[in-house]
Amino acid sequence: MKLIVKVFPEITIKSRPVRKQFIRQLGKNIRAVLRDLDPELRVTGVWDNLEVETDLDDPKLLAEMTERLRNTPGIGLFLEVNEYPLGDLDAITEHCKRHYADQLPGKIFAVRCKRGGKHPFSSIDVERHVGSRLRQECNAAGIDLKKPEVEVRMEIRDQRLFVVHNRHEGLGGYPLGSLEQTLVLMSGGFDSTVAAYQMMRRGLVSHFCFFNLGGRAHELGVMEVAHYIWQKFGRSQRVLFISVPFEEVVGEILGKVDNSQMGVILKRMMLRAATRVAERLEIEALVTGEAISQVSSQTLTNLAVIDSATDMLVMRPLIASHKQDIIDTATQIGTAEFAKNMPEYCGVISVNPTTKARGYRIEREEAQFDMAILERALERATQLPIDRVIDELGKDVQVEEVREALAGQIVIDIRHPDAAEDEPLDVPGVEVQTLPFYALNNKFKELDENRQYLLYCDKGVMSRLHAHHLLSEGHANVRVYRPA
């Protein structure tokens, strides 16, 4: 398979050195994203377009390559092509006919040609000649340049002809690694996951910072969704997941801060801690998922007071977004189901939260707060590469594993729905249910407690983690299914 990758249009208007730098970075990212599928992958070109070639012919692997490229920042679109020596107009027609003859009978079509280089014909000459012959020789219904049912596409570069047989839209944005880095404050809900996606889509490498308010299940859920976002949109770069234990901070706020000021002060403590983390990692900006007036702490007045806790730039990509638009984006990128099933821990709930915080009042309340507690939280923070976070979590978890499922037991396939659909799990003589890992904790209590359940995933890590959590919650009827 050969692909022609067209870069994000904004890259093409950069100065020559910057343009070359961005396109070179995109080439590196494409190699990194596809290397595990094809170590022999070839990526060439440094100016207008990149050419990607693979000798693989497995349809599943090729489909996975296509999906990964669609989600790689920096790509405007890419084309699946077949390359031929140019030849004359009749030769061009024959190559197009080979690929499009089966699609044209009874159809209205148009021919589109893009051309670069010196030739004895123009792009319009090619379109007219090829269109006329295909209409006559392929039993097409006619030609319509405005609303064709089929488009015959080709590109000509010097003495090379590329017949296009598939076109895929890319993510746009700049290549990850070509711009600065950010630290995203992650709660795992709709807003923070979409905010992270927006920054990555634009081309900013985004690390993840989670403030654990006291729920182990919540921490696990946020790790899972952060790993998902990175794997789908940012896998070309190494990023970190930082978890800061904030239970003591919450306790101090509950014990010493006026109820109406709790939410604003908690956000200020998070910004202080995130700033320290970012400075240590030499990251230049923080990112949150806040939108104007979505909740009481997000009025303009409150946001200004919250931001005064740090000198670092705080970016809010969703600031003017409607909630439904955010949910729609989360659905599109695959994080909505994570958010819907995310365990929550609300330790700071104001009965009458202020919508107009005043700086002097906040300073007075914070004077009661023991800042040594915030320092302890930062000292106890954990930091892991995002690609190892799930493995590290499961490393010391001990759960009974079984190699064989028996009649009467139920195997629960907890893989992501895409993986379960691509390769359905079949265990002869045993019932198999599909329940994605992100919904497992909420849905498990609805299952028959008199049955025994075996959790299954590809590597056994996610199933061990969730089995361990369910056992700690008092569900004794859980094991891990690891077929030989």
UniProtKB/Swiss-Prot annotation:
Reactions catalysed according to its record: [ThiI sulfur-carrier protein]-S-sulfanyl-L-cysteine + a uridine in tRNA + 2 reduced [2Fe-2S]-[ferredoxin] + ATP + H(+) = [ThiI sulfur-carrier protein]-L-cysteine + a 4-thiouridine in tRNA + 2 oxidized [2Fe-2S]-[ferredoxin] + AMP + diphosphate; [ThiS sulfur-carrier protein]-C-terminal Gly-Gly-AMP + S-sulfanyl-L-cysteinyl-[cysteine desulfurase] + AH2 = [ThiS sulfur-carrier protein]-C-terminal-Gly-aminoethanethioate + L-cysteinyl-[cysteine desulfurase] + A + AMP + 2 H(+)
Record keywords, A-Z: ATP-binding, Cytoplasm, Disulfide bond, Nucleotide-binding, Redox-active center, RNA-binding, Thiamine biosynthesis, Transferase, tRNA-binding
Keyword Cell membrane in annotation: no
Pathway assigned in UniProt: Cofactor biosynthesis; thiamine diphosphate biosynthesis
Pfam families: Rhodanese (PF00581), ThiI (PF02568), ThiI_fer (PF22025), THUMP (PF02926)
All copies of domain Rhodanese, residue ranges: 405-483
GO cellular component: cytosol
GO biological process, one term: thiamine biosynthetic process
Main location: cytoplasm
Cystines in this chain: C346-C457
Domain THUMP: 63-167
GO molecular function, one term: tRNA-uracil-4 sulfurtransferase activity
Active site: C457
Locations listed in the record: Cytoplasm
Residues that hold ATP according to the record: L185, M186, K267, G289, Q298
EC number(s) from the headed UniProt entry: 2.8.1.4
SUPFAM superfamilies registered for this protein in UniProt: Adenine nucleotide alpha hydrolases-like, Rhodanese/Cell cycle control phosphatase, THUMP domain-like
Family listed: Belongs to the ThiI family.
Function summary: Catalyzes the ATP-dependent transfer of a sulfur to tRNA to produce 4-thiouridine in position 8 of tRNAs, which functions as a near-UV photosensor. Also catalyzes the transfer of sulfur to the sulfur carrier protein ThiS, forming ThiS-thiocarboxylate. This is a step in the synthesis of thiazole, in the thiamine biosynthesis pathway. The sulfur is donated as persulfide by IscS.
Protein name as it appears in the record: tRNA sulfurtransferase
Organism: Ectopseudomonas mendocina (strain ymp) (Pseudomonas mendocina)
